[in-house]
């Protein structure tokens, strides 16, 4: 069987991945808190772990991999957003959850096998907290229940490589008079009548952030599973606290064997910030006409453990490359394809996506279009709606883009069938409507030109078929 090697944050080494059960490979990735649009940085872990999910399915079989990514739908940020907008909390979370799914779908991400909402697992959280209290790892104080870090002191901080004393001195923690130790963190907090709350042995309240992932992963994957992933910013305190809770509540297990963390994202060499004017949501870029596949390509062009810099230049280069590759692989729809061994070697070496992309460049140069298509598919970069139609020079609806895309397919089909009379007829008609169907130097279809005959409409393009 193919060997996968992954960098394990827990051991700080690249290790051979050996699943607990090859017939039931299990992965948990921390998902979003649903109160706003996903920004560009939120998209990176989704794409990274989507590629890992695809690789695991390739190696172990789609029916033998379980991927869980949660939604945090109870949180003080959500409460604040609902109050700010004067809308019910449930409306905010439902709307934002769908936004996230739509935007990540546009980035080519497969939906995980399970997408639990925190509010669906409150009883499991209460049960885990009760277990921690009973075992002396948690205590009640002024309506709160807190995890006692001193009860796990010899292990706490190993993931992030910090000592408890150093963390007390320098970490950002909530200091409250009811804490026995400044590092103790909230498992349960009281709720006022205007905030979401559930009945519990400690009164009406709501869970802390960290207990949510521990309870959901235990319920869906068990006390021991293979991989836990997330952004580097979650390593401390979130992942550190998850380990403490889960291992203390279920000492018979060892929680996650492998921990993977992706690095952060910059924009044009600077930290993404609203104050700098370089803060983008995924939807912002999609609405600017940047295809989701292009965003994904830029993400994958940098190794997941290195900081990534989003630039306009990279986006343009990615688009040109993808359109060329899509043109080369267009006639292969009915062929049986499989990725090249070198492509798989790159991905199995700690998700070396830049190396995998370099292999795709080689395959294109060597005219191995079947392996190129297979590699694109495995990276989630196969063509979708935007096939062959370069960026419009004007604001273009999805409907117009799809109609132009259909013309491109028909034109190429005529050419491939050597029906040059019909190909020429369609080319001339399309040109009059504002779409130049000649092949560009990048291998794609030339842009529709507003200078030819204005912006084409769907009806005009449909009439050409």
UniProtKB/Swiss-Prot annotation:
Protein name: Cysteine--tRNA ligase
SUPFAM superfamilies xrefs: Anticodon-binding domain of a subclass of class I aminoacyl-tRNA synthetases (SSF47323), Nucleotidylyl transferase (SSF52374)
The record's free-text note on cofactor binding: Binds 1 zinc ion per subunit.
InterPro entries from the UniProt entry: Cys-tRNA-ligase (IPR015803), Cys-tRNA-synt_Ia_DALR (IPR015273), Cys-tRNA/MSH_ligase (IPR024909), Rossmann-like_a/b/a_fold (IPR014729), tRNA-synt_1_cat_dom (IPR032678), tRNAsynth_Ia_anticodon-bd (IPR009080)
Gene this protein is translated from: cysS
UniProt short sequence motif 'HIGH' region, positions renumbered to this chain: 32-42
Keyword Transmembrane helix belongs to the record: no
Binding residues annotated for Zn(2+), in chain numbering: 30, 213, 238, 242
């Amino acid at each position: 069987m193919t060997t996968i090697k992954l960098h394990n944050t827990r051991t700080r080494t690249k290790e051979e991945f050996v699943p607990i059960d090859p017939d039931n490979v299990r992965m948990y990735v921390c998902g979003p808190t649903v109160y706003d649009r996903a920004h560009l940085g939120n998209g990176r872990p989704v794409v990274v772990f989507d590629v890992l999910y695809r690789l695991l399915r390739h190696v172990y079989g789609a029916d033998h991999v379980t991927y869980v990514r949660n939604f945090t739908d109870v949180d003080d940020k959500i409460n604040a957003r609902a109050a700010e907008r004067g809308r019910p909390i449930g409306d905010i979370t439902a709307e934002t959850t769908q936004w996230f799914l739509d935007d990540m779908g546009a980035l080519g991400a497969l939906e995980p096998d399970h997408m639990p909402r925190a509010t669906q697992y409150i009883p499991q959280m209460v049960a885990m907290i009760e277990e921690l209290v009973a075992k002396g790892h948690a205590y009640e104080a002024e309506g709160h229940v807190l995890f006692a870090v001193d009860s796990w002191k010899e292990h706490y901080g190993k993931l992030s490589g910090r000592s408890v004393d150093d963390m007390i001195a320098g970490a950002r923690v909530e200091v409250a008079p009811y804490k026995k130790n400044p590092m103790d963190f909230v498992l349960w907090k009281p709720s006022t009548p205007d905030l979401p709350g559930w009945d519990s042995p400690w009164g009406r309240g709501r869970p802390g952030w960290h207990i949510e992932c521990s309870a959901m992963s235990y319920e869906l994957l068990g006390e021991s599973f293979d991989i836990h992933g997330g952004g580097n910013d979650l390593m401390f305190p979130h992942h550190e606290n998850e380990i403490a809770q889960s291992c203390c509540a279920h000492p018979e297990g060892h929680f996650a064997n492998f921990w993977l963390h992706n690095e952060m994202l910059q924009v044009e060499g600077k930290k993404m910030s609203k104050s700098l004017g370089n803060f983008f949501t995924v939807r912002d870029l999609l609405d600017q006409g940047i295809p989701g596949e292009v965003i994904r390509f830029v993400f994958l062009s940098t190794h997941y453990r290195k900081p990534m810099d989003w630039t306009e230049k990279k986006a343009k280069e990615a688009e040109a490359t993808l359109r060329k590759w899509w043109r080369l692989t267009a006639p292969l729809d009915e062929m049986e394809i499989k990725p090249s061994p070198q492509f798989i070697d790159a991905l199995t070496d700690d998700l070396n996506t830049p190396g995998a992309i370099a292999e795709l460049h080689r395959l294109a140069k060597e005219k191995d279009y079947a392996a190129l298509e297979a590699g694109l598919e495995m990276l989630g970069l196969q063509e979708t709606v935007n096939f062959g139609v370069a960026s419009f020079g004007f604001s273009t609806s999805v409907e117009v883009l799809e109609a132009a895309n259909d013309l491109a397919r028909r034109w190429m089909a005529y050419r491939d069938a050597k029906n040059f009379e019909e190909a020429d007829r369609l080319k001339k008609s399309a040109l009059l409507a504002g779409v130049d169907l000649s092949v560009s130097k990048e291998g794609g279809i030339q842009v529709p030109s507003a200078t030819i005959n204005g912006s084409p409409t769907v009806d005009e393009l449909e009439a050409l078929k």
